[in-house]
Amino acid sequence: SNDGFRACDRAARQLLGKRSSSVFPVPPRLALAPLTYEEINLASKAQCGKGVSKQAFYLLPKIRETEALLRSSYSDDLDWLETHPELCFSSFNGAMPMEDNKKTDAGFRERKTVLARHIPARTIERLLRDLMASVPRAQCARDDMVDALVCGVVARLDAAGRDCLPPGGQEFDEVGLPMRICYPIPTGSQ
């Protein structure tokens, strides 16, 4: 969005409670320009009254890539869903946010346990082992791999198995792209 504020992000933070900081503010659309961090940060402060986090800045190449694909003719053939891993884990955990930080050993185990309700544990272990052997840690940490797996599980759900934020409707950004976060209907709510 032009201002970096999205109702779906606010709603996700509310649902995540103590894990709400995992939904960090998206950068405003101006950040898609190929500028330095300092230039983007200053422009964002001038336009929106807030800067851009380093975490968001480092995601910009992937955001640009996704934006280009969503705005291409290929997007007509795809059913795109935005999701958030912590919201997915929380939902698969009975709408209870994860207890431990995903970067810790306990948090990693906790997320694998929740995933094992939807993917056989041996499959999870094989996938993680193969990924860790083939992808440099500097490019993808183990917690990011588990995040990708939970997002893959959600992508396979049909519409009856998921809900979207914000509740009661969908926002669109200035170029017509949907601003929504899809997540599994919490376990026990189906």
Q: Which residues make up each language-model segment?
A:
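RNase H-like (RuvC/DEDD) metal-dependent nuclease/polynucleotide-processing core
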Residues: 1-190
